[in-house]
């Protein structure tokens, strides 16, 4: 593990075999970049990070893996966006994707294999999500991929609702000259959903379990009703594949979701996002998990390059 100065901050670098990982644990527990050195000496970016001049709006940078906690996507309370209501019926604010991605973290583990970091809630986050908890993000880096674990420990006396997730930005295309049509997404979903501006989830669009990434219907689509915990993106011709495995500890995977998104057809990235459930989970209840007093739940994601 190596410390590197970067735009007035110190980021961390791990070299594991031919893989290099860059992260800034204290800012959103953010994995910034994953790249691989190929046999000919060239470097291929897998997790995308853009060229930026400053880190002032770190959470707004489209790159790396922003952590989404306590809830993914937009939340609503009776059609009003950026609010939510808990079991007590009190309306509270909740920004898109929650508070962790723009939050501060304290590093609790730092070694040659990765890091763990604990969320330090701001006063705003404490008021909006008023529970006694520990939220910990842990990465373990390997030669051909990594594991990331989201852990919520309930230190209080009431159940804590959550539905966290990841917002991975992947470099696309992987190979010069290829297009999005050359990449195949395979997700074992039995249902697709769209999130409406009212907060409701509606069914559609109609998609197969095997789609190329140039299909515009994939953008902002929630894939759920998963028949398995494995999905992938494969490059035609070379057969190179990013394989995802997800898992849960002490809770059900019934409403687990994969969200696909990109900003436009010219963006140098494509987001494939494992979520614990669909957006607006406090209101729609789909994918909403509860951690009992004294209990712990985990959401696990493994990504490997084959």
Language model features by range: what are they?
Residues 1-147, 155-161, 168-306:
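Surface-exposed acidic/polar loop and edge beta-strand patches at domain peripheries
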